[in-house]
Amino acid sequence: MSRIGKQPIPVPAGVDVTIEGQSISVKGPKGTLGLTVAEPIKVARNDDGAIVVTRPDDERRNRSLHGLSRTLVSNLVTGVTQGYTTKMEIFGVGYRVQLKGSNLEFALGYSHPVVIEAPEGITFAVQAPTKFTVSGIDKQKVGQIAANIRRLRRPDPYKGKGVRYEGEQIRRKVGKTGK
C-alpha cells in the first residue's frame, strides 16, 4: 500500500466536497477547484467525512497513480482553505519590479520593460522593488507562473544576477583568472 495514498484527507469545516465518478470538486472560502482522477483510482468519503483514495490492485501504474491522486486531491483542499504563495526576489543593479494594475512590470536589463499579465486566479504583490509574491488557490498554476517569471532572467552562475525564488541558493562559478 502506498504510504502517501493510504492516508485519509481531512476536510475542514466550511469546505464542500462533491464527488461524481472520477471527477471531484472542492469548494471553500477562497474559491472552487476541480480535478478528474485517473481511471482505476477511486475517490470516496469515509464515515468521518474525510476523503479516501483507493486503488483496485497492486499493478505498478496503479501504485504510482494512487499516491499522486491523493496528493492532488489534498492540494485542492489546501488551496481552497489556505491558498498558495511563492515568494521571489530579484538580484542585479537596476533590476526591479513594479505593480501596474494587476500586472507585473519588470526592468531586467533588456532594452524594454517586460510585462507579465496576471492570469485568472493569480494575484501578484510587490513588497519592495526587488521582492514580490505570486499567490493563488491552484498550486500548479502558481508554480508555473513563478517558473515562467524566473525564466525571464535566470540567475547567472558568475555574478548571481537574475530572478530567483526566495532562499534559493545559486551555485556560483569562478571566473577566468587574469595573467
Curated annotation (Swiss-Prot):
This protein binds to the 23S rRNA, and is important in its secondary structure. It is located near the subunit interface in the base of the L7/L12 stalk, and near the tRNA binding site of the peptidyltransferase center. It comes from the Bacteria. Belongs to the universal ribosomal protein uL6 family. This is Large ribosomal subunit protein uL6. Keywords: Ribonucleoprotein, Ribosomal protein, RNA-binding, rRNA-binding. NCBIfam families: L6_bact. InterPro entries: Ribosomal_uL6-like, Ribosomal_uL6-like_a/b-dom_sf, Ribosomal_uL6_a/b-dom, Ribosomal_uL6_bac-type, Ribosomal_uL6_CS. The gene is rplF. Part of the 50S ribosomal subunit. GO terms for biological process: cytoplasmic translation. One of its GO terms (molecular function) is rRNA binding. One of its GO terms (cellular component) is cytosolic large ribosomal subunit.
